[in-house]
Amino acid sequence: MLRSLVGSEMCIRDSIRTAGILYGYGTREELAQAGADLICRTPEEFTKIMLSEQQGDKRMNATERKIAEDLLSIRAVFFRPDEPFTWASGIKSPVYCDNRLILTAPDVRTEVETAIMQTIEREYPQAEVLMGTSTAGIAHAAIVGHMMKLPMGYVRGSSKDHGRQNQIEGRLEKGQKVVVVEDLVSTGGSVLDVVKVLRAAGAEVLGVVSIFTYGMKKGLERLAAAKVRNVSLTNFDVIAQVAAEQKYIKPEDVARLLQFRNDPSDESWIGGTN
């Protein structure tokens, strides 16, 4: 169990780790009795540990590989390092991601939704409600909610300008334990906006499950600072490695892709320059 103590409120969430992390009030003995193996005295210490957890074990597991293979096979993720795409922000990227294509590929869709369900059952067994991000996470939250027989809803990017002016669609009671379902995490901004809305509504956000993460430092740091845990089915490093193994890209391109991942604003990876 991974535990965080803030003031007198104990929040417990499951983790594959067997260590407890607490910070807040109380003597070291009191905190240890509460189940902590590691005690942090400041939010900064806690954030550092959370960041370490977000980075996680770099070894590829079977699910990461399978989902990577699936996304590559339907071109939901594909690489073009010699002819980079341009994001809306102006950043040039060697990768294009469109996880909406998952919905049009029934076999892959089944693999992905089953993996999301298994991840929630393993990492967030206390989940009471699934909330999709608008719009990419809505379908996945709905399908998995049906599979798990859990209520689902979604969070709009902004409140409606008519009717009840809801930003949260679906019934959500204060104190309910929520898992956010997202398709893609890059800098973390959009999913953190959703978490903020849910917390303001009184929900206890257990964490996020996403299909794919870039693993960008900025995103990891922002999630850790907000004390939000994200568990992704696969990640940029795994997809780059699998893409090279299956000859979607050249083996020498992997280093360039990771250079982009480490600092998207640095365009020295383009054309193989250093």
Where are these regions (language model features)?
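Single conserved hydrophobic/aromatic residue that forms the stacking wall/gate
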Residues: 1-7, 12
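Short beta-strand/loop segments at the ligand-binding rim of alpha/beta enzyme cores
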Residues: 14-19, 204
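Glycine-enriched alpha-helix->loop->beta-strand junction motifs that scaffold or abut catalytic
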Residues: 16-17, 35, 150, 228
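PRPP-associated nucleotide enzymes
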Residues: 44, 51, 55-181, 189-274
